[in-house]
């Protein structure tokens, strides 16, 4: 995929084959594609020239640090990073608790508020290789370990103007927000498809009793088809800033999270005792499904967002 082709159609909506196999890998692919999305939609020509192609081809890896900013936009948290203007850029301090797909030479995009200028925000690329950034390993997760998730500390990080994605960041965030969410769709769509496959796999030995369960593979097949169609329809116009379109995107994301949990729960019940073995993938899919429902924007945040729109 050549850089410059992705900014018209978020590539993550096509990630469901990855999500069908592994939720953690799909999540990391979302992180990388979101980094591509940020660069593709920046108006900073020097940033585009230096990073655009390398992000898109995977020569430089990285992720997204918008969990805290996304929550701050809806009054759930305060922005955790502060920056002050200096010659040639900004100096940034603060800490982010969760940023994924990181390593010693990776980049990620995030947002700080300008000191003494409440509400004025700047989005930038953070370079994990510099000494002013410290990556703190997180405690073991229920699932999704191996995704390069760290707490990140900023100790007077110098952010050159060439690393600024958007200043001011408000209009830029409104431009990229739908794509940011639609990029997550593949995680849920792929997981639901595999849960349907799991239910079908045990139909021969257990179908005579599983037919009494209230949710069947055919039910989720119809739901999956509807979610796929809606995702692709919304992905045709990711820069639409109308409130009605934004509501549809948020509702879709909410439905994807809830459908993922429902499908994994049903698959677990269809498998019965065999699904309770650590060796069976259905218990992993259940744990991954909860991640789809709690990763930013989480189910509770999405419901608040719908209330606020």
Predicted regions span which residues?
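Glycine-rich flavin
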Residues: 1-95
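DPxDG-like acidic metal-binding loop motif
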Residues: 95-130
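Glycine-rich beta->alpha junctions and the first turn(s) of the following alpha-helix
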Residues: 139-225
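Glycine-rich phosphate/cofactor-binding loops in nucleotide/flavin-utilizing enzymes
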Residues: 273-309
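Generic structural signal for well-ordered, non-transmembrane alpha-helical segments
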Residues: 190, 218-225, 250, 254-261, ...
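Short, charged, amphipathic alpha-helical segments
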Residues: 211-219, 243-250, 280
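C-terminal helix-coil-helix/basic helical segment that borders enzyme active sites and/or dimer interfaces
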Residues: 204, 225-258, 265-277
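Acidic-glycine-rich active-site phosphate/pyrophosphate-binding loop
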Residues: 8-9, 85, 162-170, 272
């Amino acid at each position: 995929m050549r850089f410059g082709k992705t900014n018209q159609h978020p590539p993550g909506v096509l990630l469901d084959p990855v999500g069908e196999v592994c939720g953690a890998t799909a999540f990391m692919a979302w992180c990388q594609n979101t980094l591509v999305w940020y660069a593709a939609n920046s108006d900073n020509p020097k940033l585009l020239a230096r990073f655009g192609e390398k992000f898109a081809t995977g020569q430089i890896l990285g992720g997204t640090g918008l969990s805290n900013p996304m929550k701050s936009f809806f009054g759930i948290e305060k922005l955790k990073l502060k920056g002050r203007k200096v010659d040639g850029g900004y100096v940034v301090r603060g800490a982010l608790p969760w940023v994924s797909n990181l390593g010693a030479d990776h980049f990620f995009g995030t947002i700080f508020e300008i000191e003494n200028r409440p509400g004025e925000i700047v989005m930038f690329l953070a370079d994990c290789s510099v000494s002013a950034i410290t990556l703190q390993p997180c405690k073991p997760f229920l699932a999704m370990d191996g995704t390069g998730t760290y707490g990140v500390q900023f100790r007077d990080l110098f952010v050159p103007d060439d690393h600024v994605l958007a200043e001011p960041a408000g209009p830029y965030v409104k431009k990229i927000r739908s794509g940011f969410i639609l990029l997550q769709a593949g995680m849920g769509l792929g997981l639901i498809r595999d849960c349907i496959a799991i239910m079908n796999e045990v139909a021969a030995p257990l179908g005579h009793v599983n037919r009494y369960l209230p949710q069947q593979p055919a039910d989720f097949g119809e739901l999956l088809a509807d979610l796929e169609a809606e995702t692709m329809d919304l992905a045709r116009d990711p820069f639409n800033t109308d409130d009605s379109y934004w509501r549809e995107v948020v509702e879709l994301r909410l439905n994807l999270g809830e459908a993922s949990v429902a499908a994994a729960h049903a698959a677990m019940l269809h498998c019965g005792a065999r699904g309770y073995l650590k060796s069976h993938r259905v218990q992993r899919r259940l744990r991954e499904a909860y991640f789809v429902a709690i990763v930013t924007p989480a189910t509770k945040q999405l419901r608040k967002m719908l209330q606020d729109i």
